[in-house]
Amino acid sequence: MDDKVLVTRSSMPPFEEYVEMIRPLWESHWLTNMGTYHKQLEVELKKYLGVPQLSLMVNGHMALELTIQAMGFPEGSEIITTPFTFISTTHAIIRNKLVPVFCDIKLSDYTIDEDKIEELITEKTVAILPVHVYGNVCNVKKIQDIADKYNLKVIYDAAHAFGEKIKDTGIGNFGDASIFSFHATKVYNTIEGGAVAFRDENLYKKLYNLKNFGIRSEEIVAEVGANAKMNEFSAAMGLCNLKYLQQNISARKDRIEYYIDRLSGIEEVKLPDFRNAEITYTYGYFPIMFNAEKCGEKMRNYVYDQLRLQNIFSRKYFYPITADAACFKNKYKKVPLENARYAGDNILVLPLYPELEFININKITEIIKKTVQ
């Protein structure tokens, strides 16, 4: 058994395969600025995700931040979003000088509660920014219906949902844009990286300029942009990892099924549900939620500590919820967020990666059983 079991482990191709992939870079000396591998990866990912347009970025955060910027929302406008997400989602709104309006979530799947969105809409609302949390897909139809009714943009944070589908339609086809993260901790990684999927060809041109300092031509800088270009080493890693993605997903599924088999029947613990036949899952996370009413409000933290004593590292995703982050707590509109806070207080994400040994899953689940029962 490994000495240390981390919550995740980066997927990597065979070493020699990656070396051969990057060897031509020593000949071309073209290391960034939309090189050959960058262009090739955009084509391959468009095909894999089944989306009409795709723009690669240096990371998922910049993909989201620049997409919001590209929409051209007036300063001070409001974007309705979830507080149960990684802090990057909220930062991207605020860094664009916009106002996050937090909407509570559903405890069934931890995604934004679409039935509570409409009551939060004001004359300042310009967009909805839902998150496919842990790969659980939002109610895209109802969210789009609301957006159409009020003429709002929909930007999905799909960082947890790369490669997922709804009835054979790639997740990147919903809303006005979908953001993906290719961070080293994700199911699919380019070491660091991200992308935006969308339909509007004009948005591609806008994002192309924005990720290159706003430069439109050698002598024209048309807008204030950023340096958000993916480099060739990351693109090469992405091309290599794409070959092994299905193998990676299959191994993750096997381990999730083993977790569920070992933990099913424990009434103090809510397990994730991957049984929706309309969804093609990619199994990025294994979150469990402790029933505070049955096992106490501190059980999640206690289990976390017990695992850590055995050199097993789980994560409290997402605690605190972004609405309670110290950097902007109490700065924005107060909305009841009981479900989001309950989830933040009681969810623990367990280790999951293709090479995770089943003997380690046995140890993890035994610790959980002994602790809660």
Question: Can you annotate each of these PLM segments?
Answer:
Residues 55, 80, 101, 154-155, ...:
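Structural detector of well-ordered beta-strand residues that form the stable sheet scaffold
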Residues 85, 108-109, 135, 186, ...:
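Glycine-/small-residue-rich active-site loops that bind phosphorylated ligands and cofactors
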Residues 156-190, 217-222:
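Conserved active-site segment immediately N-terminal to the catalytic lysine
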Residues 173-209, 232-235:
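Active-site PLP attachment segment
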